[in-house]
Amino acid sequence: MATVNNRLSIEQVRAIVEHNDRVEIDEATRRSIIECFHFLEAFSKDKVIYGINTGFGPMAQWRIDDEHLNELQYNIIRSHSTGAGEPLPTICVRAAMLARLMTFMQAHSGVNIATCELLVEFLNRGIYPVIPQHGSVGASGDLVQLAHIALALIGEGEVFYNGERRNTAEVMQELGIEPLKMFIREGLAVTNGTAVMTGIGFVNLFHAKRLLDWSTKASVLMNEIASSYDDFMSETLNGLKLHKGQNAIAEAMRELASGSKMLLNREAELYRRSEESTFEHKVQPYYSLRCIPQILGPVWDAVASAESVLLNEINSADDNPIVDPKNQTVIHGGNFHGDYVSYEMDKLKIAITKLTMLTERQMNYLLHDRINGILPPFVNLGVLGLNYGMQAPAFTATSTTAECQTLSNPMYVHSIPNNNDNQDIVSMGTNSALLCQRVVENSYQVMAIHMITLVQAVDCLKIADRLAPATRALYDAIRAIVPTFVVDTPKYKEIAAVIEFLKK
């Protein structure tokens, strides 16, 4: 059980989103939310406040009569439930609901506590509104996608429950849950913010961390297979560059390589008198083997930056207007604008694309016998010409990497004015997060094929017993899923199984 106040750590977000930890609201935070609601209730009676007694967006110039104020809140929910495309994965919906709840935990939205309690109920019971992927321009927040969450909260639309897509009203009646009622601005408060892009962003972040970890391990195993000199990962060399990510990757590689009998010591091998005029072993390996700290270092930095920004976003008030009980006022502005998340998702997808490109190049090294000089073509353990080894899986890896490269074009600078130019510059943050999600999924596919290629190479060279304990554990884990193969068999199911292993 996670007790939620107005701040979440990355560990808490992961526990709630990935491990389905239950949620309860901290009592002090509960009191603050109730106090904020009562302040707004009194403050708003004789004032013009956007979205309470005015229309929305460019329609804000029209005042709404008192008898229609409740109807207004339902109208924004129903009118904006217009998404299209496939539904978001339920893990992303769970993360989005948590992000919306956290905005209300800041006690600056003026919502009735019932709104927060119902979001908690949905999270704890695993009720996930059906949210189509497309609809957000990310700049009055995720209006369309969040409207689908609000639609479920008022007992309409559809939800996923126990793996089934069902009518919301039926599920709520079955569980004895009352639909949300509108009090002052609940409709606007639920729909107006960055929760969906932030939720998808966190799911992307967790997977990006895993991919970086797998890439680092695979890179050590790559260098063991190639019997590389180990000085490229030395503390002295990497310490001469001040980038935190580069040094973190180099340190991780040194730890993973500890105990290896395959890596060479340059001083022992080359820094002694030699009469050779031509060297059989490469003095310096290819960049995809030697420059790993410099390539994965920026990926590490991008992941760290995304984590910092996403934590700031989920622990912020991204509503509009903002209710300020302390100063006895209501402030109008643009905290719903998703530029921070949009920019980070663009950076993260570029970083994961580069990681994927590194993976594909490392795999190419293993497949290309004239480059590696130690393995048969395509790591083919069968009869050359009759059997094909990893030749065909490489097509999948190459085409998928190419798609990542195209998807890496930034959304952040693709603003299109809309909403009758009321929203004349927008973030496209949810689109950026969705594209990042696609890149992450692609990267797992390439990584899975690379992992199978790596263990085939280890078996070809018969070096499993000479690997470092960490890379031997990786070898054993992949071999438990994909046994050594010589003859040609369909590999799509094994690739899928390795992907699932990598994700966990």
Whereabouts are the PLM-identified features?
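Glycine-rich, flexible loop motifs
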Residues: A2-D46, E71, I76-P132, N223, ...
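Cysteine-centered functional microenvironments
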Residues: I131-S136, K326, V330
